[in-house]
Amino acid sequence: MTNEEIKRLVDEVKEGVIAXRRHL
C-alpha cells in the first residue's frame, strides 16, 4: 500500500468515528 492509500483509509476511519459519535 502507498502512503496516499493509507492516508485515505485513516481519513475514512476518522470520518466514520465522528459520524458515529454524532449519531449517538
From Swiss-Prot:
Which reactions is this enzyme annotated as catalysing? an N-acyl-L-amino acid + H2O = an L-alpha-amino acid + a carboxylate; an N-acetyl-L-cysteine-S-conjugate + H2O = an S-substituted L-cysteine + acetate
Q: Which GO terms describe its molecular function?
A: aminoacylase activity
Protein EC: 3.5.1.14
**What are the protein's UniProt keywords?**
Cobalt, Hydrolase
* Names of the cofactor(s): Co(2+)
Q: Where is the signal peptide?
A: none
Keyword match Nucleotidyltransferase: no
The subunit structure is: Homotetramer.
- Similarity annotation: Belongs to the peptidase M20 family.
Full protein name = N-acyl-L-amino acid amidohydrolase
What is the protein's species of origin?
Parageobacillus thermoglucosidasius
What broad taxonomic lineage does this protein's source fall under?
A: Bacteria, Bacillati, Bacillota, Bacilli, Bacillales
